[in-house]
């Protein structure tokens, strides 16, 4: 932000302009006039401010050299004051003579120009001289302290106008940045809510899949129970059929061989005992099947070891059945004739076929259960791995986003710190330059004030003319500021500026 320049009239000093006197009159001068002009320049030389370019150059006249070679007289303060007054009077006298001579020459030249028509070259030269004089006059006016002060005020007014525009632009940029930050925060919140919704949807889907899997599993258990009941009914029907067949054989045997009643009775008793034993085995089988169902339900949640035990148990039952069947067959062979043997053989083969079919179904069912359990275990393992992978991915994304926001904030803080340090450095440098300028201006103003006091009444008339000129310049510069669009509050200081004579 530009700092407000001092309002105490401080300004940078520039080298004074010197105008070629030949621009104001004829080009020919007498030798005496040239000598007087040189003498006038010698007397006025102490009052001229040396420009920075001329500080290393010293011009000595013959009189100065002679004076420097002479012995330095010891002068009192009164002698110094008297010498200054004498030199001042002589200088004023020479200036008056030179001015009168210049006015006379200008008047003669004007009369001569009026009598003789100007040539084209003279017209061009006059235009060039007028432009040069106008430029020189403008430069001389611009070197005046009040005009420099006005220029400083104009520069300050333009600077603060630009500063206000920059401040307004900065406010707008900050507002846009805040709006953009709010938009980014809203987008991040929306993304976070979407991620949560997706996670909840996946959780709901997972729960639904588990529920469906449990329902399918329950339905399979029910289906197996129905299949077991159906198989049990089939086995009961087969047993009833076998009993009927045995009864038929017994009746035929009683009709055909009355003499074998005792043997038949014994056979019936043996069959009854066998039936009783088979009923007991059936009840035991039911108990074992119930236990087997419980083991299957528990096996769904545990391992495959129980299936092997179940297979061994079934194998043992099958062997017992085969042994019992062989025993019955031996008994029937002893009690029946050839036809009975054939019928018994057919019944035994039928029973063995049914037993083999039952064992194959049991084995296929066990294999299906094992395959289903393996698939469930694989699905559960894959689901857990997917869930862990998803959590790891979400954690990685959150960490990346956090590090990105942290890097952006650090970069922004570093930029703001650099801007603050640069601004402080510029302000400090500007302050030092301004203080040096103020001090230099203060010293220069003291010197100029001393010079103004020495000039006294002789310069009052010129000061009044200059005041009027400065007022015109002030009005012109106010018009320039108004045309440049500078607000009235920044033109007020220049408007209030008082032009003192």
Swiss-Prot record:
Q: Which GO cellular component terms, listed alphabetically, does the Swiss-Prot or TrEMBL entry include? A: motile cilium
Q: Which residues form a coiled coil?
A: 75-114
* Location (main, coarse): other
Q: What keywords are annotated for this sequence in UniProt?
A: Cell projection, Cilium, Coiled coil, Flagellum
Q: Where found in the cell?
A: Cell projection, Cilium, Flagellum
Question: Looking at the record's lineage, which domain of life comes first?
Answer: Eukaryota
Q: Name the family the entry cites.
A: Belongs to the CFAP45 family.
Q: What is this protein called?
A: Cilia- and flagella-associated protein 45
Lineage runs: Eukaryota, Viridiplantae, Chlorophyta, core chlorophytes, Chlorophyceae
């Amino acid at each position: 932000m530009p700092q407000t320049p001092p309002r105490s009239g401080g300004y940078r000093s520039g080298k004074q302009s010197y105008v070629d006197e030949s621009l104001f009159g004829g080009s020919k001068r007498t030798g005496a006039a040239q000598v007087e002009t040189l003498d006038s320049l010698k007397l006025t030389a102490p009052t001229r401010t040396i420009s920075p370019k001329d500080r290393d150059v010293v011009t000595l006249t013959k009189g100065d050299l002679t004076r420097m070679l002479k012995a330095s007289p010891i002068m009192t303060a009164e002698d110094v004051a008297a010498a200054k007054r004498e030199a001042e009077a002589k200088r004023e006298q020479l200036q008056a003579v030179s001015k009168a001579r210049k006015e006379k020459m200008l008047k003669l030249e004007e009369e001569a120009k009026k009598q003789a028509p100007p040539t084209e070259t003279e017209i061009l030269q006059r235009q060039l001289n007028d432009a040069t004089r106008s430029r020189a006059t403008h430069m001389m006016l611009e070197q005046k302290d009040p005009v420099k002060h006005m220029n400083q005020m104009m520069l300050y007014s333009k600077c603060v106008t630009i500063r206000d525009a920059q401040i307004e632009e900065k406010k707008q940029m900050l507002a846009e940045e805040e709006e953009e930050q709010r938009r980014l925060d809203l987008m991040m919140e929306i993304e976070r809510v979407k991620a949560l919704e997706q996670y909840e949807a996946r959780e709901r889907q997972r729960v639904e899949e588990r529920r469906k899997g449990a329902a399918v599993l329950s339905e399979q258990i029910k289906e197996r129970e129905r299949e077991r009941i159906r198989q049990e009914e089939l086995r009961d029907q087969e047993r009833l059929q076998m009993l009927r067949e045995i009864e038929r054989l017994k009746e035929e045997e009683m009709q055909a061989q009355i003499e074998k009643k005792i043997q038949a009775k014994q056979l019936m008793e043996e069959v009854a005992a066998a039936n009783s034993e088979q009923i007991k085995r059936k009840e035991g089988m039911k108990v074992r099947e119930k236990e087997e169902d419980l083991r299957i339900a528990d096996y769904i949640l545990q391992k495959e070891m129980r299936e092997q035990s179940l297979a061994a148990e079934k194998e043992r039952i099958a062997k017992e059945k085969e042994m019992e069947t062989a025993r019955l067959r031996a008994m029937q062979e002893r009690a029946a004739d050839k036809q009975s043997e054939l019928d018994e053989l057919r019944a035994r083969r039928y029973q063995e076929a049914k037993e083999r079919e039952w064992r194959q179904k049991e084995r296929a069912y066990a294999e299906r259960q094992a395959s289903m359990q393996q698939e469930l275990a694989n699905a559960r393992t894959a689901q857990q791995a997917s869930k862990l992978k998803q959590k790891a991915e979400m954690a990685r994304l959150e960490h990346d986003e956090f590090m990105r926001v942290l890097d952006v904030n650090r970069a922004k803080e570093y930029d703001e710190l650099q801007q603050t340090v640069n601004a402080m450095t510029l302000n400090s440098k500007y302050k030092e330059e301004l203080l040096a300028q103020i001090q230099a201006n203060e010293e220069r103003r003291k010197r100029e004030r001393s010079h103004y006091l020495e000039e006294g009444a002789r310069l009052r008339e010129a000061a009044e003319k200059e005041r009027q000129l400065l007022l015109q310049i002030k009005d012109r510069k106010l018009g320039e500021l108004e045309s440049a669009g500078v607000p009235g509050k920044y033109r007020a200081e220049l408007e209030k500026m008082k032009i003192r004579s």
